[in-house]
Amino acid sequence: MKITRFAPVALALALAAAGCSLESTDAAPAGTVKVVVGYQSKTINTVTAGTLLKAQGYLEQRLQKITDGGGAKYQVEWQDYDTGAPITAQMVAEKIDIGSMGDYPLLINGSRTQANERARTELVSITGYNPKGALNMVVVPNDSPARSLTDLAGQKISASVGSAGHGTLVQALSRAGIDPAKGVEVLNQQPQVGATALESHQVSALSQFVAWPGLLVQQNKAKLLYDGAELNVPTFHGVVARRAYAADHPEVLQAFLAAQLDATAFLNEKPFEAADLVAKGSGLPQEVVYLYNGPGGTSFDTTLKANLIAAFKDDVNYLKSIGDFADLDIDAFVEDGPLRKAFAETGRGDYDATLASGVNPSKVTGTDPICAVAVSDPALAGEVWVDGADKPQPAANPGCLLRAVQAAKAQGKTIRAVYVPDAELGTRWFADKAIWLREGTQYLPFTTQAAADRYRGSHPTAAPVSYEQAVTEVRG
């Protein structure tokens, strides 16, 4: 893969500065323990260790309990970045104590920090994951003729090298028969820079992590070309802590993990309210936040599952494909002891039972008000968000969902967003941005044209239909 790079020193400086918002405080007063938390407000499947955690004050509350019990005083400093790379740079410099980032950046974090015992990190929890890889996607301009990833051969693609979005691109290109080393030119850009490059047609595609693909599509600035779920490889974001800091202040790490469990429980129990808080804290539209963090989207589960760690081990070769990185012993890097202790101390369920579960803790439930049936199948269930409603209304299947939209429009109501799972891969997506097919009386939504084409290949009677047409013609 031809990669347009900065010089190493310039790159390091750029990563350390890019998209960094520091809520910096003065040095902690004598007798006060300071903890610096690096997070990514716009990488919204990390919110239980960042944006939502901060908004709810769970960490500060947990630390205050220690103080009230006769312990030390604590000071929390939050540092917001656009990607995981600058968080790693700050951890190498021993300036961030706890950070969150995606799976590929976590590999780099573990590799880069292990040379210095004071900087050395360990993976202590997961924030959110998708079992198939749907958290990373490739988008193209709306007027792009590309129908599948193979159409990008020889083109320029924007990605943040070392990010989860870039890692997915490398795997996807290989599977598509495109040589990742020579078949495309990757421009190493921060997400917002890449978004601008895509809009101005300086690049043919953008490969990024949440929430960028959904944001650009929701803003009508791009369309989805490749759904990372096609890889059928788990992707996740997680939390790393500096081992030296955790050894010096084990109570802080325990408080952080307990607070993360608090945030995770809140999000899974009240996803719509959580999306509002995250939208306000990140500056992202609530419709985009709820796309990824709503029921049936990202699985917010803190446990270090075997399938996630197995996929993580398979990703190690990625390190060597992008530069000179030291090998990383994943088994030594992963440490579940503190999280197990947090589960036991908080009473938030049984760790081993949660570890063994592969079910998304948050799914669409309730009674479909249009079809008057219970919503029971996550592979079909969607939601219709009518402006002014207390929360989105559930739909049992795509047909019921289209009827709900039809009814709302007939009543003159404004629809904020409609969410539906992809018929092939199950990825939660915007219904009005999906590719729809009609087969008899059945309506099938797909995230990408390639997915719809695959379906039509084995179902020749399925016919393309626009979302607007489907809403107009659907019948009970």
Predicted features, each with a name:
Residues 14-19:
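C-terminal motif of bacterial Sec signal peptides marking the signal peptidase cleavage site
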Residues 28-179, 185-188, 204, 233:
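Short, glycine-/small- and polar/acidic-enriched structural segments
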Residues 186, 192-281, 399, 407-426:
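Pocket-lining segment of extracytoplasmic ligand-binding domains
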Residues 320-365:
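Conserved C-terminal helix/tail region of periplasmic/extracytoplasmic solute-binding proteins
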